[in-house]
Regions:
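A structural-propensity feature for long, helix-poor, extended segments
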Residues: 51-87, 189
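Polytopic transmembrane helical bundles with strong interfacial aromatic enrichment
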Residues: 4-6, 121, 168-169
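Phosphate-handling active-site elements
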Residues: 38-58
Length: 209
């Protein structure tokens, strides 16, 4: 059964068990999925309201983007655990002969690269989700303004969590060109996303103060 098909209670219990997966990566993806779900909700609470008629077309576009990102981030919950399981499986490979040891090392490097690409892709989705959320600020139902703030917080948590997973995976990769590429691009995504999240949160905070 997929993680996304579990109830909230079931997911929390398996997350808190002694099973190594799901772990922080899947939890980060869930945080991000919750964030963009709130953005989508705010759009739904805005569409069709006369008070926000001038923003109707704009918010419909934001809603469509949010729905698409929601699907992708929900998929990321399982993708992260699947990537971790590939790494775990390598530890079970034989290592008696030199050939087996070499094959195991090669398999581990390949698995770690795949495990790095998963949270990195998540970071890209989250930055897109934050950009989408920002598009709703000031043009959506003010009664749900706090929900956009919570959306930004959840998305930022997901972003930071995904970044930590990128870092822990590249720490075991020997291909320095790969490491430098993902570290550099990851830092850029982290900065861009964090700035967006902070801007959204501060704007909402000031509007409610």
């Amino acid at each position: 059964m997929k993680l996304v098909d579990l109830s909230i209670t079931e997911f929390a219990k398996v997350l808190g068990s002694d099973a190594p997966a799901p772990g922080g990566g899947s939890a980060a993806a869930l945080s991000a999925a919750n964030g963009i779900s709130l953005t989508k909700m705010v759009c739904e609470l805005t569409i069709g309201k006369k008070k926000y008629a001038e923003f109707e077309d704009h918010i419909k576009v934001v809603h469509e983007k949010s729905a698409h990102l929601q699907d992708q981030l929900l998929e990321a919950i399982d993708k992260d655990t699947e990537a971790f399981n590939v790494v775990s499986a390598v530890f079970d490979l034989p290592k008696e002969t030199d050939e087996e040891k070499a094959a195991r090392r090669e398999a581990m490097q390949k698995a770690l690269k795949h495990a790095t690409e998963s949270p990195f892709s998540m970071m890209e989705l989250i930055v897109e989700a934050l950009e989408t959320t920002k598009e709703a600020v000031g043009k959506s139902n003010t009664n749900a303004a706090s929900d956009l703030g919570v959306a930004a917080l959840n998305l930022k948590a997901g972003l930071q969590g995904a970044w930590l997973n990128v870092l822990i995976n590249i720490s075991g990769i020997k291909d320095q060109d790969f490491v430098q590429e993902y570290h550099g691009k990851g830092l850029e995504l982290l900065q861009t996303g964090s700035d967006l999240a902070d801007n959204i949160y501060q704007t909402i905070l000031e509007s409610l103060s």
